[in-house]
Amino acid sequence: MTVKCKAEESLTCSCVDVGTIIDGSDCSVEVHQFYSTEADANAVLERLTKKARNTESDPCEIKSEIVAVENGVQLNASFTFSCQAEAMIFELANR
């Protein structure tokens, strides 16, 4: 999962405006992980999908693929939520 930091710290109070963290622009979470077997990758995808469904207010768009790589498989998945707050909740729930 990737998280981009766009926050700019205020020099007067060492704080950050919430609008710089949640600006509504990043509603997607990308997952790229390696597993020994396709069954392991499918189990994780099922768990992530369930978490996404529990987080969504409007349907989350989920795209995924499992590709064979040397010594295993790679899970590539994209979860696009209706708002950035849901994407952040999903990311935090998977840490």
Curated annotation (Swiss-Prot):
Disulfide linkage: none
Coiled coil: none
InterPro entries: DUF406 (IPR005272), UPF0234-like_C (IPR035571)
Listed transmembrane segments: none
GO cellular component: cytosol
Pfam families: DUF406
Recorded family membership: Belongs to the UPF0381 family.
Protein name (record): UPF0381 protein HI_0400
Organism: Haemophilus influenzae (strain ATCC 51907 / DSM 11121 / KW20 / Rd)
